[in-house]
């Protein structure tokens, strides 16, 4: 009795609180799970069983009453209760509902067309489906397939970004207020951030979905796969269907017929070879021709020369135009100005020189055109028609494109027409150092301005302000362009109009013959410059997986693994008897020439940048110490030689010499990157590929004939004998002794025994003498 009285008193006390009274009088007191959840903090032992038990009740879930009424979901459908007008005890304005309520909303609720949103979210998957539809399947062959496991891209992307760069882009696109400080990538690609913001603005997508879309758009999804043949992303995404260990399914994948992708590939390769040729101080034009003719690309299953692809393509980008002019090709009446494509429509200008002052002191000349001309311009998604006369942009009409592209297109047109106050007095932030390249070549003032607007958004807007700001005519609202590139601005730029659709490029069947100057400037027969090396966009880190760069200067352009292998192969070929070969340089202790061999220089870009000085100090010390003591192995010297190019620097050494792709070699220890065996010192294995070490003296196909030489025999070691090369042996007299590098770099003493003597008859005797001299 006392227990019941205690409960009654507690109940009366709780009822003094309105919310508690409502819960105990209106709520489902019989619902054990509700009170169990509120009165215990222990972990559920069997959550799956508890969930099934809870869902077996009549109304296991809650729903927003207002949303149910707006969606016109009835309380009952086909004699099945969907929800009841009983307020839930745990959440205000929510009522109890059954699982059938969800089924009714899915099948009988209001229709919502989300097809466009779904296509946008899963764009990469739909793109893969479309590419599979384009595949041309051929015959199935049964044969042994030589597959190699490599890191490949399994998804084609328009622009490849690193994982950290994608995260920065996601933060700056979706969470501007919470984003960290701008990294170098954000500062250099802020236009991309604005483009992504405008792309996903006012779309019914939550931020998690947009983050997923951004990752799929820029992530090529690299994986380690056993591959064979061409390793283009379009082919790698279905490599499982193209072959196995004993069969090959012939097919033409979508990458072969994808004209835009092929054009981008050719453009990227041309950009690389142009920049490599420009880095050459002398004969840049001849170097460019050499690079083009020594390069080939794999198109599908076919290996084609880059020279043929350049002459066939209709691409008018500056890099392709430079390569085409180097080959003496023809082009339509087009020209390039930075990343902007231009095509003249009418008019013929006359060059006139004028002067602009840098920091108010130094006068710099630039050229402009005095007569009126009309042009078509194109930059990314924006197009334009404009007219120039004297030093002004008379008018311009911009079609299509996002705000950022329209702004940059207008800025480049202003610079091309020499429009604005900055062609009278240069911006204060432009210094004398901006007027020349690192090699000391002069940069024309218009390209100095192009570089200036790329440095910051403030510089770009400062140039646009120099165009002039006027009040927008109410009748032209929607067709005038504001300073931010928008259509509906209260104040707009002078003589700049916008139309919604793109402007079509005018066609021209007339072709012009191109020539290339030593400064890598393409010009036509009238002397008009149509493209220069300064028009090329900033170099991008691109790995060419299906391009063959045969020229030794371009070894670094291969994928890094192949470049390391080819670099070591080139060093091993220097194990000859020439004066400039590695054994001779070691004998003369000419370390400076050894560290600056062309093959060593070509491998220098493959070394980890932040450790190159420390690695150089360690590698040089290893080489000099071994040579000084006389106990060295040419194999080990070859291993560390690529790390000796840079100036030595003090620092902590962790025992391994790393390349930029995180692979490494370790002095005195074999690994997958570089290995060799004393049992068979005629081969060096680099990334599993056997490279034969050239034999300095004797038949390259006979390991037992290392010391055999026609007319000579091995004798006891005589340090007084002169060191000679193989080319000088013809001058050695009868009975004279000389020293020569043999085998893998060992020094042996030889004696002239006859003018002509068959080396094959002395095999056993000479080999025995070599062993005795050891």
Curated annotation (Swiss-Prot):
Location, primary (coarse class): virion
Gene Ontology cellular component list: host cell nucleus; virion component
GO molecular function ontology, one term from the record: RNA binding
Keywords: Cap snatching, Eukaryotic host gene expression shutoff by virus, Eukaryotic host transcription shutoff by virus, Host gene expression shutoff by virus, Host nucleus, Host-virus interaction, Inhibition of host RNA polymerase II by virus, mRNA capping, mRNA processing, Viral transcription, Virion
GO biological process entries: 7-methylguanosine mRNA capping; cap snatching; DNA-templated transcription; symbiont-mediated suppression of host gene expression; symbiont-mediated suppression of host mRNA transcription via inhibition of RNA polymerase II activity; viral RNA genome replication
Function as written in the Swiss-Prot or TrEMBL entry: Plays an essential role in transcription initiation and cap-stealing mechanism, in which cellular capped pre-mRNAs are used to generate primers for viral transcription. Recognizes and binds a wide range of cap structures of target pre-RNAs which are subsequently cleaved after 10-13 nucleotides by the viral protein PA. Plays a role in the initiation of the viral genome replication and modulates the activity of the ribonucleoprotein (RNP) complex.
Assembly with partners or alone: Influenza RNA polymerase is composed of three subunits: PB1, PB2 and PA. Interacts (via N-terminus) with PB1 (via C-terminus). Interacts with nucleoprotein NP (via N-terminus). Interacts with host ANP32A (via C-terminus); this interaction promotes viral RNA synthesis.
Family: Belongs to the influenza viruses PB2 family.
Name of the protein described by the UniProt record: Polymerase basic protein 2
Taxonomic lineage: Viruses, Riboviria, Orthornavirae, Negarnaviricota, Polyploviricotina
